[in-house]
């Protein structure tokens, strides 16, 4: 009997090794075609990468690891693992959301989602976003086809709108505008919207190439992807606040996890609070409330009915920043690049501050987010001074604030060096890795952390310099 099971085990191991050999053979042949290497050399490089950092032959081939120096391969591989972890978290979120909405148990929920994915090819994110758990299964295929068609139409309409805007600005024919946009896309990798907001129609090809774009930002993000242990935390405002509470310096809670009495006591010394959805971004869903002893219970009842999110004491910003733009808390975005496995700069540093910008509220909005009507100006890392005028998402440039009339270029951000030091200290204590955007507010007593963003975009670096026809990719090239 035991001999029978031992024989089955040996056969299973033999079959596994046989499958692995076939997969490696397939990867070797593919890499040979891509590189021109001979069989032995391709096999050797794949084997060495596997022994050094654990890359499978299929992963080596699929992700073209032959393009990267050996010292960089581990970093790239960790990025792949991190992206898989993000996908896993999205899947879990979708399952939990469907269970909550329907009352299904986990097994049935997974079964239903898998069936829909098999029928339609739907992503987990779309399954949750469009509430497919509430739609009869027999209607899923038609509904998702409609969604995809709508997206295709919206993309086409968006591109046509951009072409029309370029025609209006330049006087070109529609055919010429489309041709020039496509040419810029081929030469620089820019997106349609980047052609418009960065005014590529006014830039020669060399400057277009030097503009830091979405594709460049994505490349850095994939190279320095966040370590798995930080992904869950950074994707959830509650966990981020818990891990970095030392730097927040203000009371906060989760709206669905606190009693009325505790809520009232927590914010007893606050005059204003702000609510942010747990998975919100770009200022979406953010609301502010005045709070007092008289209305605290009423505010609690209102906020506790919102989707799960964090509630924080509203930050009273430094008076100089209020004088500049009083409608919102104007935050500093400090972008860092860090890696524990290899230096990110030629002088051996494992963490580097890439750039900083001041996000300025543009009107009456309570948020300063650039995508919510705000403006941005670049900060000199040495002096803390704004070295550009402010620009908004539409490419409008402001030498003075449109509401207060305050001059923007030359404004010195209070406590800027302390804000940079705070980011460095947070890194030293946590060893958080990746390409990150730290949002920091300045109070009368110094910097406080607002939030940390995964994969900061390119626009906060590039937009302030467009009016001067200067591309800023040069300051990020050392990380590419």
Please describe what each predicted stretch is.
Residues 6, 11, 15-26, 48-93, ...:
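Repeat-associated, polar segments at repeat-unit boundaries in modular proteins
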Residues 223-332, 337:
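Active-site nucleotide/adenylate-binding loops and adjacent lid/helix of ATP-dependent enzymes
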Residues 150-266, 423:
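Conserved N-proximal alpha/beta basic substrate-recognition cap immediately N-terminal to
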